[in-house]
């Protein structure tokens, strides 16, 4: 039986999960409709669609595992279920960060202004950059999967009597946690570097505009600022998400820690829902479609009120 606070946190996290699914489903559907109409999907459309789908899967895995852990913990007892959840989590989590990193690099190469020959070379060969990131993702999986397989094979991670039993030292748990999330750390560092370079590009552009006495409210500056806001929002929200996941991992070592688990879950769900709304507001096509849907819903509501009167 859940306490009042646990019930409140579960309701909040469920609402966040629904918001994340709705927002990311909207992003995926808009891009799929564009593909159906144009018979072609742009790079940005492909990245946004992949990011939205991976976030939907991420939310479904988290919320499903949470409800099973709380209400039907005996379902997590079989070792093959633990192994399946672990593999799915690694694939979806790292794929989600991969798409987010690809999105940030795409914006960076399209918007930033640098004359360095490496930047110019990368800008002309953006497809090679994505292939390199795919290679990094595959290598990350190759490092992560054996760690999970060894943990399960050695019976170091079991679910007994409604609680996880971790049979390893804390130092070993930390090392395994780092190895299984190595790809996440790598892509997150790339995103931090990209955001830093975009800020430098904006600063140089503003100085150039000031020296030419052309003012600051030009289109390039606004695009820079909008993109930096999107990247910074992702960084902040993803840090909160990762903190929530880390709290849930800590719960593996603490018996009867449902309240702490709920708090971690609520924190983790802030990222997929809120950032999808930020992407919708930052993308002109997605924003236009969302406004049309809201206007349609408003018209339907007004029509219903007229029929009732």
UniProtKB/Swiss-Prot annotation:
The chain crosses the membrane at residues 8-28, 44-64, 88-108, 128-148, 183-203, 234-254, 260-280. It is found in: Membrane. It is a multi-pass membrane protein. It comes from the Eukaryota. It holds the Pfam family TAS2R. Residues 29-43, 109-127, 204-233, 281-309 are cytoplasmic. GO terms for cellular component: membrane. Glycans are attached at residue 161. Residues 1-7, 65-87, 149-182, 255-259 are extracellular. The keyword Transmembrane helix applies. Keywords: G-protein coupled receptor, Glycoprotein, Membrane, Receptor, Sensory transduction, Taste, Transducer, Transmembrane, Transmembrane helix. Putative taste receptor which may play a role in the perception of bitterness. Several bitter taste receptors are expressed in a single taste receptor cell. Belongs to the G-protein coupled receptor T2R family. This is Taste receptor type 2 member 114.
